């Protein structure tokens, strides 16, 4: 999520603890809480006391806001303690006792502040074994998607858990850290009309009292608290068959009436799981795999609970006739990521949150590998390119995190789930895999999983396992990417001297955009592999650049190469600055010698040069006509982003007509040929490119014919959803709204109110944020404060409006004027994201306003300070880029048809 995933929840009645869970209607009063006799722990619990097993029993009713629980915790005490500290948040302790040395004694609750619950004893206990019994009550949220929460679908209510990163403590007292990894016994007391799911298959089910049933699940393998999970409600079960060495049963769990929408998930899930098992050469570690649908969107997207993956239904349920290409590819990627976690994160768990990358980066890396293996025609070797680009963009900021960031506060735990951990981590893994070889890397992965199965691991453990079979200690080089932020910029020059082999001169520094206040004085140990023309064909050579400067001899070159690609396969996590005419030579004849991923990578390098101020935007725009005719969808789509990204800040109003005319001249014929509607026999590339090209020409190109057609087709789609292809509808609705009037707004608003399909409802709500008429947009923004739609959905109106220069001010002032009301309605800590409403600004006045308004407010939300710092830095960089590039852009659009030589050169 960003993600953002982990559900942990365990239930269980302990035989030794004869506590009966009170009904939610008549919960016992809370026990008296004492003041702490000594200061409680700060961020981490004392490892001298460890759990060895949990037995948890929960009584949950999806229609109610409270639950009751009883938990028994087997303990191993290494030293005497008089107060035992556990994690617990917003729990009301009703009874507690401790068994030690054959005796039972009272355990008195002790106030530990927001995150902790203490239990004091009449005398010190330990060392030795003990058992803590606790009865308690807690809250079920309809606002948040953490701990235990409940959501409504039609007339039904569903209760689900989400415990990652540290939210199991909202559901039960526990040692809520990943290193405390032990078996769990879970029991749920639920209404007879509800289904109950957890990490393991059901062991037994019996009738309870007053219309309830008691469902006991098999004991789990060792799990940290964040990976325990439950789901309760009138779910339906879709059998997806069995797969793998152990014939693992796979099921799709959906809200009532949604079974028909699980077709694709049921078809694909077993295939993905089987491919993962074959790569790891380790059987799927758990007894079953359920994928459970959460009715509403959440802030975590999907969660890799062992044996019970959870995800928002919008991610994996669709009516068969509405399965778009993006939906199918999206679910396959989600499944590969979450199922990959069953090995990376579940079987082997990081010891502490500073190594979150061992879960998320590895799961992201294996996703690309599995999808490329399964469907090579989908991305043609480019699965990692877009995610890598996202990471490099984030990593160019001074406020960027390290992959392995020290954890000093709750903020750091939450901030760890970002593109640095996921995408940068995956890119660095791919780079070192390429350097040491795929087979050796795969053996290292197998060794890592085997050595640490059912336990915990650290970065040191992982790197030792990867390097064991290679004869290389990769830890020093790898750690330079783990333990410092930033992206290397490698400047490359070609040296050809008579009597010696050609060489590449190399130098490195941190890549920083124009205007950055950061220091470029950083050094990595960078694996650099270059491919080049050698007179007879192509050859490659590699070197580990460990110092500020270095060189790479092109050992197979028979003469000075006609071209050199300094980042073979685009697998290196670095940007390239080409000296002299190297870039021009590489792109001669359209760069036909380059693989698709490499061509995209070179374009990304060009964009980086523009961002750094080392290449003028006007020069890049000279490349656009040729790039727009490229046969590869990915190149054309990248080109539309280059052109479309100009409109917000670099095109003055006086030159908007020239800008629009340029877009129509370059892309117009293709857009008109494509049209808004798909045609029989079209391939997937054509269907996918339509939204990018037609959307650009209709919007930034101001094509009135395409705009009118978008409005007409929108009205038709509102009556018949088959009228427009599912891969195009979002762009079409946006274009229609941008030029739409009050009547169209009323139609879309009315349709959103009536829509029962979750995906279509969300897209209609978001579309209401795309209208440019101020009066219409004011009415749309007001919906974010009404009870007409779920606040998590209606806030999309504000985000859509903030992305458009003509409505950004309205959206930003709406957030400022209604900040407190929004915070009351939105999930807890959602306020951390609200500074991003000002992210699109590009001037000093708005920058100062954003900082003044959010500086103090952001500190009250977990992760808020970093979000604000990111937003402010992005505004600063936009101001600097505008200062460097606006003259070049303006000069180009004053004479867009005049040929200008593009200087690809040097620093």
Protein language model features and the residues they cover:
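Long, ordered, helix-rich scaffold segments
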Residues: 388-389, 518-520, 533, 538-542, ...
């Amino acid at each position: 999520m960003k993600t953002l995933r982990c559900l942990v929840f365990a239930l269980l009645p302990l035989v030794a603890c004869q506590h009966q869970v009170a009904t939610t209607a008549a919960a016992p009063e809370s026990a008296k809480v004492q003041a702490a006799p000594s200061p409680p722990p700060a961020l981490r619990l004392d490892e001298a006391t460890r759990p060895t097993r949990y037995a948890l029993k929960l009584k949950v009713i999806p229609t109610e806001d409270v639950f009751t629980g009883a938990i028994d915790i087997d303990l191993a005490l290494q030293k005497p303690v008089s107060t035992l500290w556990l994690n617990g948040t917003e729990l009301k302790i009703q009874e507690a006792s401790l068994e030690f040395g054959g005796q039972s004694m009272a355990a008195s609750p002790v106030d530990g502040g927001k995150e902790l619950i203490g239990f004091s004893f009449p005398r010190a206990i330990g060392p030795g074994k003990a058992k803590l019994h606790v009865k308690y009550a807690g809250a079920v949220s309809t606002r948040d998607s953490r701990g235990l929460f409940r959501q409504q679908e039609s007339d039904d209510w569903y209760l689900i858990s989400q415990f990652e990163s540290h939210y199991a403590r909202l559901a039960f007292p526990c040692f809520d850290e990943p290193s405390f990894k032990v078996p769990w016994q879970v029991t749920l007391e639920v209404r007879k009309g509800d289904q109950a799911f957890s990490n393991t298959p059901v062991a037994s089910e019996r009738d309870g009292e007053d219309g309830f049933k008691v469902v006991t699940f098999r004991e789990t393998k060792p799990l940290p608290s964040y990976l325990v999970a439950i789901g309760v409600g009138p779910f339906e079960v879709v059998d997806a068959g069995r797969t793998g060495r152990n014939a693992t049963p796979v099921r799709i769990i959906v809200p009532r009436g949604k079974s028909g929408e699980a077709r694709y998930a049921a078809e694909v899930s077993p295939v993905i799981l089987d491919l993962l098992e074959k790569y790891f050469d380790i059987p799927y570690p758990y007894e079953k795999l359920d994928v459970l649908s959460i009715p509403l969107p959440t802030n975590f997207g999907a969660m890799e609970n062992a044996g019970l993956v959870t995800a928002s239904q919008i991610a994996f349920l669709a009516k068969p006739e509405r399965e778009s290409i993006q939906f199918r590819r999206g679910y396959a990627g989600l499944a590969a990521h979450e199922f990959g976690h069953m090995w990376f994160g579940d079987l082997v768990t990081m010891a502490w949150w500073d190594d979150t990358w061992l879960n998320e980066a590895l799961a992201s890396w294996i996703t690309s590998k599995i999808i490329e293996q399964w469907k090579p025609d989908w991305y043609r070797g480019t699965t990692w390119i877009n995610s890598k680009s996202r990471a490099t963009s984030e990593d160019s900021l001074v406020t960027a995190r390290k992959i392995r960031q020290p954890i000093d506060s709750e903020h750091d735990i939450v901030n760890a789930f970002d593109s640095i951990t996921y995408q940068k981590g995956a890119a660095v893994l791919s780079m070192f895999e390429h350097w040491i070889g795929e087979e050796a890397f795969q053996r290292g992965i197998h060794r890592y999983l085997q050595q640490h199965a059912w336990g915990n691991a650290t970065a040191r453990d992982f790197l030792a396992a990867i390097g064991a079979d290679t004869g290389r200690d990769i830890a020093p080089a790898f750690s330079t990417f783990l333990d410092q932020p930033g992206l290397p910029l490698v400047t490359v020059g070609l040296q050809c001297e008579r009597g010696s082999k050609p060489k590449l001169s190399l130098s490195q520094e941190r890549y920083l955009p124009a205007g950055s206040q950061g220091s470029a004085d950083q050094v990595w140990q960078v694996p650099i592999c270059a491919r080049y023309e050698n007179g007879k064909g192509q050859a490659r050579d590699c070197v580990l650049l460990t110092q500020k400067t270095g060189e790479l001899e092109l050992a197979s070159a028979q003469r000075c190469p006609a071209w050199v690609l300094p980042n073979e396969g685009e697998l290196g996590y670095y940007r390239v600055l080409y000296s002299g005419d190297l870039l021009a030579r590489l792109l001669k004849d359209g760069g036909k010698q380059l693989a698709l991923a490499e061509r995209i990578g070179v374009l990304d390098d060009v964009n980086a040069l523009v961002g750094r101020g080392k290449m003028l935007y006007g020069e890049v725009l000279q490349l656009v006509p040729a790039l727009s005719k490229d046969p590869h969808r990915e190149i054309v789509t990248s080109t539309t982003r280059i052109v479309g990204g100009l409109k917000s800040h670099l095109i003055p109003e006086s030159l908007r007509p020239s800008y629009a005319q340029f877009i129509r001249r370059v892309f117009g014929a293709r857009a008109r040929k494509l049209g808004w509607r798909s045609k029989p026999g079209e391939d997937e590339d054509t269907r996918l490119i339509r939204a990018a090209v037609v959307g650009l020409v209709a919007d930034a190109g101001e094509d009135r014919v395409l705009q009118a057609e978008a409005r007409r087709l929108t009205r038709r789609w509102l009556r018949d959803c088959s009228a427009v292809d599912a891969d195009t509808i979002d762009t079409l609705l946006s274009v229609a709204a941008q030029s739409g009037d009050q009547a169209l707004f009323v139609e879309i608003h009315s349709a959103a109110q009536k829509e029962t399909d979750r995906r279509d409802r969300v897209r209609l709500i978001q579309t209401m944020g795309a209208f440019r008429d101020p009066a219409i947009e004011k009415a749309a923004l007001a919906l974010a404060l009404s009870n007409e739609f779920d606040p998590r959905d209606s806030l999309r109106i504000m985000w859509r409006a903030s992305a458009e220069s003509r409505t950004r001010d309205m959206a930003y002032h709406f957030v400022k004027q209604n900040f407190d009301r929004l915070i009351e309605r939105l999930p807890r800590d959602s306020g951390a994201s609200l500074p991003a409403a000002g992210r699109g600004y590009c001037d000093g006045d708005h920058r100062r306003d954003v900082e003044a308004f959010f500086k103090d407010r952001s500190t009250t939300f977990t992760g808020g300070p970093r979000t604000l710092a990111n937003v402010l830095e992005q505004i600063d960089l936009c101001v600097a880029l505008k200062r460097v590039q606006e003259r070049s852009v303006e000069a180009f659009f004053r004479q867009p048809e005049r040929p200008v030589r593009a200087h690809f050169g040097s620093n």
